Amino acid sequence: MVLRSHPFPRQDRPQGSVPRAVPGSPVGPSTSTHSEDRHGPSSSVGTVIGTGTGGLVEAGGQPQPRSSETNGSPSPDPPPGLRGEGTREKSLDPLPQAAMPRGPAQPPAQRPPGPAASSSARRSQPVPQLRKRSRCEIAPSSEQEVRPAASGDPQGEAPGEGGSPAGRSGALTEKQEEARKLMVFLQRPGGWGVVEGPRKPSSRALEPATAAALRRRLDLGSCLDVLAFAQQHGEPGLAQETYALMSDNLLRVLGDPCLYRRLSAADRERILSLRTGRGRAVLGVLVLPSLYQGGRSGLPRGPRGEEPPAAAPVSLPLPAHLHVFNPRENTWRPLTQVPEEAPLRGCGLCTMHNYLFLAGGIRGSGAKAVCSNEVFCYNPLTNIWSQVRPMQQARAQLKLVALDGLLYAIGGECLYSMECYDPRTDAWTPRAPLPAGTFPVAHEAVACRGDIYVTGGHLFYRLLRYSPVKDAWDECPYSASHRRSSDIVALGGFLYRFDLLRGVGAAVMRYNTVTGSWSRAASLPLPAPAPLHCTTLGNTIYCLNPQVTATFTVSGGTAQFQAKELQPFPLGSTGVLSPFILTLPPEDRLQTSL
């Protein structure tokens, strides 16, 4: 498309690039000043306009009349047809400068005769406002060629002026701006690209040093970052150490929502499995003081008329310890000392997530005896005792049961209430109280198939069931044995209740939680009618009292006591034995000897 030659009225000019001069073009007093050349103008389709004191230049090389601002004569308006074409071209988006090449240069228009303006005068002249860019704005690079128009006609040729430093500075500034935008785009999250920077060494020589440094600073505050580094760089050893750290401190991880919520379901399962997967489960026992040890006892008297003998000095009670059993050596050994602050008399005990919890109890003796609401926790993987959130109500002779990651404190002396502890919120919340008419003191409780069962003690042969989903209690069928119950455990969907028979020993009654039926499983003769206290490990039920440590094995449809008797616990003659199961770490002496 060919455009006619016509003058343009003065218009505001936007910021643009400077058209550079073609080597060989004359540079003299008639050329434009640097202050005006710093913003290169744009032209309409087919014509490239150069601005200067010499006027406007057409691409065809014909000089045009100067505008009224230059020579004082008004410029005629362009024909209507050309005005419309200019409007359409202005509405198009401007092309990037890098895409607009240059063609051969045209000689600049001659300046009319007259005195040349001095350099200071030219600097003092106001810089005219730049026009809006057109689509065919000239590219700043003199090595590029003109792109043909859509109609197929060649575009006009652009005149240039001397490549001033100011012009080159403006072009480089725009290039730097484009490069900056590109880098910002590449740095956006999402993996569109990688900004060129310091490259990682191809060898992995630095990674062992980095992993060693991360191991030194590994704690619960940095474990997520270290785990991400280990997974990204293929460091299974470092990842395993991070999992082990979180597993060793599971209660703190559960109580930190910022940490626990950022773990995936697979990570949570792995951390939980490590609590019991890095050692061997062992049988443990804690001797709880008898409820009547703190009561008054009369002094022995001699023959009539004689003064009673002087009372022997009262010795301080020995510190309580947790003990564990070594089945290969058939011996018991102490594991750790129980804190003196923990009131053991009448407390509840259970294990959850390989932690041992002690809750409630009676502190003091006589008229100063008070119930406690404190809860203590022992971590066998770190050998550390700690305290968790106290219960809402002080309790003694309660039962503590773990179910689905929650602790349930059930009943107590003169109490029908129940409350539940969630380690993730570190809070106790009340639950449905036991049915009216029950008196849950010295009772037994166990969890089986998602429900909690309570029997024994002052409940005698009654069996109560609590559903956490419904938060409600109901009563199960009575046991066929109306004898005194000593303990109850769950194994394989069945409840095994150990009743005490005077002059005979212990009788085991089995309850099917699906069919709701009772049956007699086995019996065990005992030298003395001492209650049995039980716990389960695998398919074996360990039954303890001060005289015997027996094993009751359930295999398939048969359940019977084993003939081999284990070493009785030697220190349980003055208290109540409370057995439990814990998994000790491999570094423990008992495990290393095995």
From Swiss-Prot:
Name of this protein: Kelch domain-containing protein 7B
Membrane-traversing stretches: none
SMART domains hit by this protein: Kelch
PANTHER family with a match to the protein in the record: BTB_2 DOMAIN-CONTAINING PROTEIN, KELCH DOMAIN-CONTAINING PROTEIN 7B
Pro residues bias (residue ranges): 104-115
Pfam families, A to Z: Kelch_1
Record flagged with keyword ATP-binding: no
Kelch repeat start-end pairs: 306-354, 355-405, 406-448, 451-493, 495-538
Entry-linked SUPFAM superfamilies: Kelch motif
Biased segments, Polar residues type: 64-74
UniProt keyword Chloroplast, yes or no: no
Keywords linked to the UniProt accession: Kelch repeat, Repeat
Positions with biased composition (Low complexity): 116-126
Region (Disordered), start-end ranges: 1-174
Biased composition (Gly residues): 49-58
